[in-house]
Amino acid sequence: MCQININELEAKINNSTKDEFLLELEGTINEVIKISNMKILIDTDYIKIYSQDKEKMKLNKHQIMKIEEKNEEYIISFDSMQKAKIK
């Protein structure tokens, strides 16, 4: 497992050849969301997650503590008891 930054996460997801990703939320909010043709855009305050050119979710990037990569799985840990896994 190694730590990566937001820009590396954006590049790895956007350059991936996978057709479908799972966004798994763990913590205060628990949910599994299937996303087809996932793309990520970074702006001043948010990581915006898109599926087929439609915005699905925004994650506040100022609350991110760290992003880790483990075997094509990305784990985003927030400053609360919340994690988002992208598989």
Predicted regions, residues:
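N-terminal helix-cap/turn-to-beta initiation motif at the start of protein domains
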Residues: 5-17
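Short, flexible N-terminal segments of the mature chain
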Residues: 32-44
